[in-house]
């Protein structure tokens, strides 16, 4: 009896892990499609720090390689900055075991930073600039056309609020941009992924995590404050973070105040009404629930009830790992089976990834 119960528990745990991986894969695929992050023949340099985010990024991209509509190659790159206690063997051993092409760059930026920054001060800014330059150079040497970073949705929102609260700017962290040297495209495929999902996935996969505080730098207190604020909102107002991110994708320049984005001086009597005109004092009709709630609801719907036409290449394995009740939901959806495999819809918007 106990063995049977344990088997059911393990089956449910595996089902939840598979479901989590599908969600991460879906979000990454959607971001890649929305921002045209990857094109045919791209060689993508995945910057691997040894943290949960970069491990997850690498695994999801490797997974997508199997079914992506374009061919692309991956090379994992780690920068050994000679920080005291850095376990230099961890990443090479992991990557070799996974069969991933990799390259380790060794540059003693640790002592450069320590010489320049007074004791007790945050070294992250100078360290990141040095690291960025080295990674750009490495990308050129390896023939990479894309540089993939592991920043996720929470990082992007934190950067937005940091710039708003402390810099007086509406500026975030773009999912895709040109590198400082003008030679490479930098992409953030995890832009739609939540940190809590990445943390759960990394724990389930038991990645060999390398601590991020080996340099001894003081934490960025401003970023900590913003992070605490967003986490508190997540607890008290589910869906708010998703709604905030959606707002970053729905900007109305004529209803802000930046003269560089909109020609306010060019507005004359008789001009056409722009973006609905003056509705500042109107009672706006907002939905009863934040827009971001739909994203959360989509993830909790039974797979058969989601409106999507994408056939997941791994749906048979996904359905088989589910508890019996979930298997029935997966196998009796409104869409027909193809080649004997159940069609499992994954999202309301779906890319060809």
UniProtKB/Swiss-Prot annotation:
Single GO cellular component term: cytoplasm
CDD domains: TtcA-like
Motif annotated as PP-loop motif, chain positions: 49-54
UniProt cofactor note: Binds 1 [4Fe-4S] cluster per subunit. The cluster is chelated by three Cys residues, the fourth Fe has a free coordination site that may bind a sulfur atom transferred from the persulfide of IscS.
Catalytic activity of the protein: cytidine(32) in tRNA + S-sulfanyl-L-cysteinyl-[cysteine desulfurase] + AH2 + ATP = 2-thiocytidine(32) in tRNA + L-cysteinyl-[cysteine desulfurase] + A + AMP + diphosphate + H(+)
GO biological process, one term: tRNA thio-modification
Annotated GO MF terms: 4 iron, 4 sulfur cluster binding; ATP binding; magnesium ion binding; sulfurtransferase activity; tRNA binding
Binding of [4Fe-4S] cluster, residues: 124, 127, 215
Name the record gives this protein: tRNA-cytidine(32) 2-sulfurtransferase
Organism: Sodalis glossinidius (strain morsitans)
